[in-house]
Amino acid sequence: MKLLVMSDSHGYTEKMRTIINDNRDAECIIFLGDGEHDWDDCMADIPGMNARRQIAVCGNCDPCSFLPVTSFDNIGDHKFYITHGFRQNVKITLDSIYMDALKNERDVVLFGHTHRPFYEEYNGVHLFNPGAVMNGRYGVINIDADGDLSFEHYELA
């Protein structure tokens, strides 16, 4: 199963649209906030979006959002903790978001906010930031038939 992960578009709707169109084989699309209007525009404009699972949370630059700040989702055999990361101060430390994952028995944490691609596996918890769509960056997570995860960062040409 292919998961497309994006964050921090900040008005760069066309970059988001390109990323989504380049990854039409993704079964699930996840948006980590800071660009809710970009997300809404793409979800409305791109044919076939309703056929895919969609998960979105708000970021600190999404005022008056109706999106949740955090989402706990099971995808395959994995338990995902999905958030923008601003409330966990991820620009300073990942300790808080890691402890939240442990407390909520999550094995995958997806966050944005820093605009920097990041991946680390620590004591069985995968921490993944796709980077910022505004900089042409996004991530892909693949879950194979055995449930094994792979995490990749990409950048638009």
Task: Name each model-derived stretch.
Residues 46, 70-74, 101, 117-119:
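Short secondary-structure boundary/capping segments
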Residues 51-90:
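Helix-adjacent hinge/juxtasegments
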Residues 1-49, 62-66, 146-148, 154:
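N-terminal active-site segment of His-dependent metallophosphoesterases
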Residues 92-100:
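Charged helix-capping and loop-helix junction motifs
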Residues 99, 103-105, 121-157:
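Binuclear metal-dependent phosphoesterase catalytic core
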Residues 3-5, 74, 80-82, 138-141, ...:
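Core dinuclear metal-dependent hydrolase active-site scaffold
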Residues 10-14, 36-40, 61-66, 88-93, ...:
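Active-site environment of divalent metal-dependent phosphoester hydrolases
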Residues 5-7, 29-34, 55-60, 81-84, ...:
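Active-site neighborhood of phospho(di)ester-bond hydrolases with catalytic His/Asp-centered motifs
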